[in-house]
Swiss-Prot record:
This is Transcription factor Sox-5. Transcription factor involved in chondrocytes differentiation and cartilage formation. Specifically binds the 5'-AACAAT-3' DNA motif present in enhancers and super-enhancers and promotes expression of genes important for chondrogenesis. Required for overt chondrogenesis when condensed prechondrocytes differentiate into early stage chondrocytes: sox5 and sox6 cooperatively bind with sox9 on active enhancers and super-enhancers associated with cartilage-specific genes, and thereby potentiate sox9's ability to transactivate. One of its GO terms (biological process) is cartilage condensation. InterPro entries: HMG_box_dom, HMG_box_dom_sf, SOX/SOX-like_TF.
Amino acid sequence: MLTDPDLPPEFERMSSKRPASPYGEADGEVAMVTSRQKMEDDGGDGLPAFHLPLHVGFKPHSEEFQAVSLLTQEGCDRRSPSYQHNTMELDCNKMPPFALHNAATSPIKAEELGRQSGESLANAMLGTPERRKGSLADVVDTLKQRKMEELIKSEPEETPSIEKLLSKDWKDKLLAMGSGNLGDVKGTPESLAEKERQLMAMINQLTSLREQLLAAHDEQKKLAASQIEKQRQQMELAKQQQEQIARQQQQLLQQQHKINLLQQQIQVQGQLPPLMIPVFPPDQRTLAAAAAAQQGFLIPPGFSYKPGCSDPYPVQLIPTTMAAAAAATPGLAPLQLQQLYAAQLAAMQVSPGAKLPGVPPSNLSNAVSPSSIHTDKSTSSPPPKTKDDVTQPLNLSAKPKGSDSKSPSSPTSPHIPRLSSALAHKPICSTSASTPLRVNSIDILSSITSPGYLNDHDAVTKAIQEARQMKEQLRREQQALDGKVVNSLGLNNCRTDKDKSSLESLTQQLTGKPNEDKFSHAMMDFNLSGDSDGSAGISESRIYRESRGRGSNEPHIKRPMNAFMVWAKDERRKILQAFPDMHNSNISKILGSRWKAMTNLEKQPYYEEQARLSKQHLEKYPDYKYKPRPKRTCLVDGKKLRIGEYKAIMRSRRQQAQIPISTAGVVYPGAIAMAGMPSPHLPSEHSSVSSSPEPGMPVIQSTYGIKEEEPHIKEEIHREDINGEMYDEYDEDDDPDVDYASDSENLSAEQAN
């Protein structure tokens, strides 16, 4: 028999009727609780009962169970009721509290379990000890398997698992619970209330989170809807733009087609030979109608004429292309014809100053005189004039000079024959202004004669605008050309006395009645090509400029630009682009004031450029020596005068010699000018001859050019000092847009420096 082992007091306090908690120790060690029960009827035969905790069955190893089974088999020699009772207690102690609870609620199940365990133990007691050992191990395994099945079955019937998740002290509460007294746990209502509060808080948080998610989802829906709407609007806008572009392209194609048709018509009309067509006043229309019809002339109906008036009526010349167009469209109303001639006048209204080459005097008389009209071919020309500014640099913009700024010694009046034509029955009182004409305007004048343009007022207006733009563009180009021609063909610029004498004799031959009108009839020569713009004059002018005052093999060296000129080069171009009609003197004043207003820091880059140009010029021309322009003097009535004194005397003489407007020629700004053909023997008019006066202000042509009042003027130029020019620094080939200032403007530029 086995003796009872010495047990510690904590193990003896616990009886078999109160099993240990299945969740006893946290480390999972096996705790054996033993107690001795002495039966009243078998006082000396008490059998010890070994109680195993619940978690022993869950151990993967079975050493503990084998030791317990060996001790049980050796101590039990016979079956007794106490043994069976202890076995029942062993079975019951191995069950968890939940299983005990289930057993208490279902006694039938508990009895079956007890019976089965008793039978298995009884069977294990029979036979040899080895067999009993094996049978006990089988019983233990069977019990473990059954208890596992019971635990799995009893899981749905357990209390809600939320208590284990939410309660932090569930271990203590379960340890405090008895095996059968589950309802005696203290603090259960409070803990449940706390758990309910926690659950409500979680529910509220989840509800608020759900609302936030729904709100965010709604915002996303709204944002997506707005984006879709924006995309739709953008697509509509793009579609509208594409439609508009398509319409514009279609309109452009239509306009291009119309332009092609008009060009074809112009080409057909342009094959007709252009002639010089005089336009007669209304009272002479009946007399010249037959001859004009024979010669291809066209007489406009829009001009009025008052007999006996002193106002000039220039003889106008219209190309035969316009006559052919008017003849091809006999149904034109007077208003349409007026529009047509208005377009022609707009094309011819060029700012006075630039002259386009015209026809020689012989061709002039032949062109103006039809076969059935008798004209008196009498020409008048002002006496020879001398140039006061012989070495004056080129002035590319027209310099406005009134009647008080002209002198007999300056070639401001060209040597162009004056023609006063009188008809057989009634003489024509006609004078002309000196306004230039454009060769390129023939295209516009021809294009507006087509039927499509004659019936469209907008087209005529557009043609007028184009004509004005073209005349402004070419006016500046012609001014440069005329300045060079004057320098090359002036009387005082002739290199030999032979040339001077030949020009003087030619002038005397052309001089007719000096007291007649000093204005010739306006003419247009449409037979001139673009190559006949005075290219010969340009070449002669350049040859003269390069060889003036030097040896034949000594080239002229330009001075390097200073800082002011470097800065003014671009500024002058900008001002001319903004104000094409601004005179050079005004531009120089503006540039001088601007340069003075600039700070040294702003001028620094231009001074650096000046230093670079000076260094480059010194390297290129190491032997260069600047020779300034000499002072010029004039001999007036045997007296040697400076230019300023001479101009003052001439101004006073002109004021004394002024005559009333009725007997003097009056030039209006809108009058049509005559264009003279520059020839090797006839100098063209300088660009500063007839500048555009103020609107509505007549420019009185003085009579200082009459032979009787012309003083003998001779300009003395020191040949030894003429080599070099003040502002002749850089070639016009390098910068065609650059302007060359005159003496007064150069002085202002030097003061600005």
